[in-house]
Each structure stands twice: as C-alpha cells, then as structure tokens.
Amino acid sequence: MSEIVKTFQGSSVHTKRKEQEIGGLTKMRFNQFKSPYFKFNNIYVADVFSGTGRNVIIDEIVDGSPIKLIEGVMGANNRNIDVNFFFSDVRTDACEQLHKYIVERFKISIATNVMLASDAINMLGSILKSNPNIFLYLVLDPNGPKDFPKNEVHDLLCEFPKRIDVIPNISATTINRCLGARDKAGRQMQGWLANIENFDEGFVSSLTMKGRCGWIRRPIKGDRFRWVIVPTFGCFKPKNNWEKQDYVDLNSEEGKETVKFYCGA
C-alpha cells in the first residue's frame, strides 16, 4: 500500500460519518437511475475537491469521498448506464496519491486532474454542452471558502437545472483551512456557512430553483465543527424517506430554519 501524502486538509470525528453518507446517497441515486424513465445514458460522477482519497483521524484511516463515490456506483449494481468519473484537486501530490490509491483499491485507472475547482466546473459545463444525454452527479467538499466555485455552480444550474445533482458538504474546518490554522481561541464560528461567499444568499436557493429539489441535514448535537450536507436533485426526486437519517426537505419550514441555523441566525 502506498504511503499517504501529507497534504493541507482537515478532518474531524464526524468525517467518517460524512464520507459514509456520501456513499449511501450515491448508491441510492444510482439505484434510482436504473428506472427506464431516466432518460440519460451517460453519467459523470465528479468531485472537484477530491484530495488524496483518504483521511487520517487520530490513528484511523478513513476513505474519502472519491472512494465512497466509486463504491456507491459499484454497489448500486446498475449496468445500464455508462459512468465516467471526474476527480480534480488543486494539489498535484494529492492527485497523484488518489490515482495510486484507486488503482490499488479497485484495480482500475481513473485520471485525476490538477486544476482549480472553478476551472473543473467550467470543464464539466463544456462536457454537458457537448452531449444532451449526459447527467452530472457533482460532489462539493471544499478545502476553503475562497476556493468554493459558487458562481460557476450557480451558472451551471441556471443552464442545466434538470441535468445535475449537486451534493455540497461544508464544515467549519473549511474556514480554518482557508485561514491557515484552527481557531486556537476555541471560539465557535456561528456564521461559518454565511461566510462562504454569502453561501446562503443565492446559492442555497439556486440549488432548488427551476423545479429542483433537495434535502439538508439536521445539525448534529455537540458538533462544534458544524458540518452539513445538502444533497439536491435535478430530476427523479428520491421517494426514500431519509428523515430517520436526519434529512429534511430543503424547501420545508424546518429546512429553511436549518439553513438559518447554519448561517448563525
């Protein structure tokens, strides 16, 4: 097994749970995509903050979102749709490590692209424009708010609202990573979500515009990092009730109050 590259990225005790839920959501969606009423025959599964594919939490190694995405797609047992994986990160060493780990883990080779998240989103937009039969399944797990491609994703959703699932994963550690250090004073960052380029103003609403729908995860009691996952869907609204997993409808009153909570209201 190759050695893990030491890169500048954070994690918390909730990282394992978050990564597992990415895999669970992916498997759920790809089981849905088996329906004959799903009209797209090619899906791009993208993570534009892919990292190394592994997180170190104390003395435990936890698989990251790219690995959980691959597992979710393979676990859905859906062989009727062509799937292309698109992984990118701004760090060359992280991309190299991820490529090696995927080969070791799955015995397949998937290209990893060294680029800014904003450039990756623009490239994915060009891919969508090139073929009307392509659907995009996009995970956003940013390294820092300055890198978060809010405007690019918004523009993409305006142009292709029915052809994209967007699953943002945001935590307070993104703010700390951007600042270059954790909050040594121990202060809780009440408004961290709003600080991501006014994440709540325009972006959250764009996730469910033009007939789109989505969920937001209820806050975890005692989670000082305040991470949240906001899975949103372009078509085929999931029939599964994930309320037992603490997801609520993003457009419901509870969903709106949850957004306010994460924005420090």
Spans of features found by a protein language model:
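Rossmann-like AdoMet/SAM-dependent catalytic core
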Residues: 192-265
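Basic, amphipathic N-terminal segments that precede the first structured/catalytic domain
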Residues: 1-19
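SAM cofactor-binding core of SAM-dependent methyltransferases
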Residues: 24-123
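Short amphipathic alpha-helix with an adjacent loop that forms part of the alpha/beta core around
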Residues: 121-131, 154-157
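Conserved proline-anchored active-site loop of SAM-dependent methyltransferases
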Residues: 44-56, 133-147, 168-171
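Short, conserved loop/helix-junction motifs that constitute active-site signature segments
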Residues: 76-80, 130, 156-161
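Conserved beta-strand signature within the Rossmann-like core of class I S-adenosyl-L-methionine
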Residues: 162-177
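A short, conserved alpha-helix within the catalytic core of class I
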Residues: 145-156
